[in-house]
């Protein structure tokens, strides 16, 4: 899926994106909310292998010609999918780009791909993301207390969200 709006482009990730993904995925500051405060410890070669067959589900966010983050979606069934986003370059965080990028991506999932429900989860400590999701119309379904351990063995809690087209509030 490729989506464009103003200076934002969301496009399928390709093997040549592996070096930037590797930098992001090995950065503990970027990956901490996903449970990897020390980063993933992966290689460019490993990421290239992952991207070759599955790149239609992983996407790169480009802003004014610069890769700034990634998004993905995974079909859950014929009518619903799970999705995720990371604005990985810190200088582009807290500028409203996440909300606009999510609006663009979600409109594609609903309007272009025909999904009728989008699900996601986030770390309970990631209140900034929760605020954005709720502004977009996501409904908090549940909090899963101490439901998983991060790579340091610390218990983490997650918040599950769902969004339907009826509740979606676009910011583009």
Regions found by a protein language model. Give the residues of each.
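A short, well-structured alpha-helix characteristic of acyl/acetyltransferase catalytic modules
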Residues: 1-44, 48, 166-172
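Acetyl-CoA-dependent GNAT
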Residues: 37-92, 164-167
């Amino acid at each position: 899926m490729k989506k464009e709006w103003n200076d934002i482009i969301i496009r399928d990730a390709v093997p040549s994106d592996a070096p930037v993904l590797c930098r992001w995925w090995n950065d503990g500051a970027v990956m901490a909310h996903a449970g990897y405060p020390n980063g993933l410890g992966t290689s460019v070669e490993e990421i290239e292998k992952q991207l070759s067959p599955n790149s239609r589900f992983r996407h790169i966010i480009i802003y004014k010609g610069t890769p700034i983050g990634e998004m993905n979606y995974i079909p859950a069934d014929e009518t619903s999918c799970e999705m995720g986003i990371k604005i990985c370059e810190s200088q582009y965080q807290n500028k409203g780009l996440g909300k606009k990028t999510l609006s663009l991506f979600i409109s594609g999932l609903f309007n272009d791909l025909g999904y009728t429900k989008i699900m996601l989860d986030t770390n309970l400590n990631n209140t900034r993301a929760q605020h954005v999701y709720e502004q977009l119309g996501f409904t908090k379904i549940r909090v899963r207390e101490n439901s998983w351990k991060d790579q340091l063995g610390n218990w983490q809690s997650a918040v599950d969200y769902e969004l339907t087209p009826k509740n979606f509030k676009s910011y583009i």
